[in-house]
Amino acid sequence: MNNKKILTSMAAALMSAAALAQTPAFPGAEGHGRYVTGGRDGKVVHVTNLNDSGTGSFREAVKSGKRIIVFDVAGVIALKSDLKIADNITILGQTAPLPGITLRYFTVQPGNNNIIRFLRIRRGEEKNINDGADATWQRNKTGIIFDHCSFSWSIDEVASFYDNNNFTMQWCTVAESLTNPGHSKGAHGYGGIWGGKLASFHHNFIGHLMNRGPRFNGARYGWTGYTSNKNYSTYQWKNTVQAENVDFRNCVMYNAQGTCYGGPGGGQINIVNNYYKAGPSHSLKSTTQNGIKVDVSTGKERGNQERITLVTVSTSSNSDKNHPEFYEMTSRYFINGNTTETTKGSVTKNKDWKGVSYDKGTYTYNNEIYSADKKNLYGDAVEHKTINGVSCVKIKMDVPAPTGVITTHTADEAFSKVLANAGASLFRDEIDARYMEEAKTGTAQYKGSITQSPGIIDKVSDVNGYTEKTFATGSRPKGFDTDNDGIPDDWETANGLNPNDASDALTYSLDEKGYYTNLEVYANSLVEDIMKTGNADATKAVDEYYPAWKNPTGISDYPVINPGELVKVTYYSLDGTLLSAPQTGINIRKMVFRNGKVLTDKVIK
């Protein structure tokens, strides 16, 4: 190699290193997990089968990092035990063929520095029941971003993430917790506990829950891991209360009986431009029949249909008993731009502080509500006032907590955007499609077999939930990726790469800014339309950078339309008989899109 080439290579390496310092996880990654690096530059690992474990399995692929996970197959992976994802992993669910990847039966836990995209985790009670059985959860980690994932069917909470650093959950669906699947405490049906030390929850769909939709965690557990936060040097928090900063915006809550509440122990929470829509379970009241809590129709609206949040005071019963210094404290809130809609169609924009209620234990001064702060944990930068001999801080914040880089829509626009794009929407399954139609029409197709409450289900069978035996599968044809670098041959050829040289996947030749490897450019291209469509029409937009690429003919599973518009897929035998699920051999697949377009093709199972 001559000196000129050496200097050119060194310059390229330096440019990439500088770019990586502030490179988004992918174009459209936003919030406090925006700059997670995952497995970038790591080993490319293919998932080649739907087995629970062993060579080619998803479990084997994620057991250690630094790795980038791509998929040669699609369908349901029937887990046989809880799955823990190693540190420094990127999971590119969008690289799977139709119908995408669903994980079932056990809990999935991410690790430090994880990027997880376009994946479905639908746990269920069929194989395992325990009181901690979330579909997914994690705490005490640094650097996690979930993008366009679908979570459902949990025994405890659907998706709980708190006491993590630099976290984002964006464009996900969190719905249909199981109310009476066998939890020792009886009826559960919870959405999630959300919090963190710079944590973002934006553009998510939260639906069909009995409670915790979501519950804000606050600083009640006294976690001190905030010193590992990537932004600690910027903020220099003195304690966990100051470090607890949560941004909750542009989410849609539908038929969630216990909407937002919590925040005990202190912290800062933004609740901005969310849409709260009551559902059919809000027209019921609870009663007990044969020792089981059930819902019965009353024809009256429940009183909490327009609640924005309930501010919770920390006590010995809801907080860590080893941290009494947080007792009597609440979080502080910035609340703006939120819309409510009742079951009778009454819409109230900017409900905001008129929709806030409070636990007992707060203080009032000049018609303002205050939280106790006896130990001055909020710090001298926050004005304190002595009320009844107790040092207190105002609960209402005039300035929002840190938001990170974030796109913001109005609440009305967020409602439309979330319904069109949230969840694993590249190949939206019938479950997410149903959620969105129910939210749009104010209905619930199913009810709990025990509770009898519309939308508030008890078991997976209540909604005829799919399994590995009833859900379609898919695989890549031979010759799709000759060099096994994660990029299809046709795409490599169209973009000037070598389909016989695996090393070019992890170089930066396609991205003129040096942000993304060629493999990342390919993977991001698969969902670029979805990301751009979701972020369009914003009141506050992020100027996202998308590297240029060329689309080869015939590589898309669908024609060039937004795959998130897919609303229904049905299968037929070759003689035209409607099938409940694809059969072994050749099937005719019929795809119906929201714009009325119908496409058919043949698929092999």
Residue ranges and their predicted role:
Residues 463-552:
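Extracellular calcium-associated, cysteine-rich motifs in secreted modular proteins
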Residues 215-220, 229, 241-462:
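Extracellular beta-rich repeat passengers
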Residues 586-605:
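C-terminal tail/sorting-segment detector
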Residues 88-93, 112-123, 140-153, 165-184, ...:
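Right-handed parallel beta-helix
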Residues 549-575:
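Residue-level detector of functionally pivotal "anchor" positions at catalytic/ligand-binding pockets or at interdomain
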Residues 24-69, 504, 572-579:
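Acidic Gly/Asp/Thr-rich repetitive segments characteristic of extracellular carbohydrate-active
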Residues 59-65, 76-92, 99-118, 123-142, ...:
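Extracellular beta-strand-rich solenoid/capping regions of secreted or surface-exposed proteins
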Residues 103-107, 128-138, 153-161, 182-196, ...:
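Extracellular beta-strand/beta-solenoid scaffold signature
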